[in-house]
């Protein structure tokens, strides 16, 4: 299933002072990437875990495929761990956006809003790293094509 290329999503740091709309756009894209990982990674892990114990025998071929699937299973588990670590940062970002939405823009609140936007930027920066890592590990796990496991080494 195609996923957006995270390399195309610019990451801002605290020195760029992005605007409210830029941060919301970046957050929305990041949230979508996290949702895709949450939808795709556990089923991939399950498919790998279903095939792995079916590899039978002590042949070089069986050992090679077993090792490949163990690596893919580990990559899928690390992917899940990474996107789950990003969840608290995304939830906090949600709360900040809610605060910004509930509070009308007034001149006397400019410093407060700017501090919230800076905090939102920092949260996004941290979560981007975790989601990037999760996607990289997901790609590694997905690269292990289960269809390439020869039927001759699988138990029914």
Predicted regions mapped to residue ranges:
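Long, low-complexity or tandemly repetitive, helically biased scaffold regions used
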Residues: 9-156
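N-terminal amphipathic/basic-hydrophobic helices that include classical n-h-c signal peptides
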Residues: 1-10
């Amino acid at each position: 299933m195609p996923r957006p290329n995270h390399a195309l999503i610019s990451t801002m740091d605290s020195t760029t002072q992005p605007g409210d709309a830029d941060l919301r756009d970046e957050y929305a894209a990041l949230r979508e990437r996290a949702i895709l990982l949450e939808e795709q990674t556990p089923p991939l892990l399950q498919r790998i875990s279903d095939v792995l114990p079916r590899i039978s025998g002590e042949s070089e071929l069986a050992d090679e495929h077993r090792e490949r699937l163990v690596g893919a299973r580990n990559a899928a588990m690390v992917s899940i761990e990474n996107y789950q670590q990003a969840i608290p940062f995304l939830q906090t970002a949600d709360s900040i956006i809610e605060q910004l939405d509930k509070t009308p823009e007034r001149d006397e609140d400019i410093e407060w809003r700017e501090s919230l936007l800076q905090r939102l930027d920092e949260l996004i920066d941290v979560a981007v790293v975790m989601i990037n890592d999760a996607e990289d590990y997901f790609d590694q796990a997905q690269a292990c094509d289960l269809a390439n496991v020869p039927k001759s080494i699988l138990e029914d």
